[in-house]
Amino acid sequence: PRYLFLLESSKKMDETVTEVLKQLFPFQEKIYIVPVNEFQLAMLYPAKDGCTSEDIHDLAHTMIDTLSMEALTHVQIAYSDLIPDLHALPSAYKQTALALRVGKLFYSEQSVFPFNKLGIGRLLHELPEKLCEDFLFEIFGDITSEHLDKDTLAAIDKFFQNNLNIAETARQLHMHRNTLIYRLEQVEKRTGLDLRQFEDAMTFKIAIMILNYLQSERNVSHE
């Protein structure tokens, strides 16, 4: 049994990256590292007896930290479910490619994307574009994220990360809590959604994820 890792960097990866990875596993003869393109590497890693999903997740973070320090290269990593045999390798590659795409699109603040932990991002990625557009119009009408400044969206994202805790969010943003409340009230005035309420917060978060997804799809189609 094995795991397939897919590593991607925003800059071209040279031989240094491969050498650093090989040095990270000096006694593992059955590790295979293959360039996919100038920006991606695939690595086939044999699963040891007793290896857990947490071990694999930690390994991905170890690779990220090591490459950052020793190869001066920042990477994001997706990995597959456990591969029982090599016949399942094509399916595993599809898993990692999907995990990397969904991860970068919906969880860009993260660096590791397990295929089996994509959450709601995988569901949204499979929705038809027309259904997404209908949902956005139902929620926002003619209002889009462009009507909200980047600072407000960043504050909202931090607010969600802190489980709708106003005091903690304000502290982390070095912002007076009344300023944060004012921004949340402005969003409510524009959208009708009170982000201090869990249901409205979830609706807004999903809507923003869908907006980002549609924008990404349109950017790809214009390339």
PLM regions and their residue ranges:
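Cytosolic nucleotide-utilizing catalytic cores of signal-transduction proteins
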Residues: 1-223
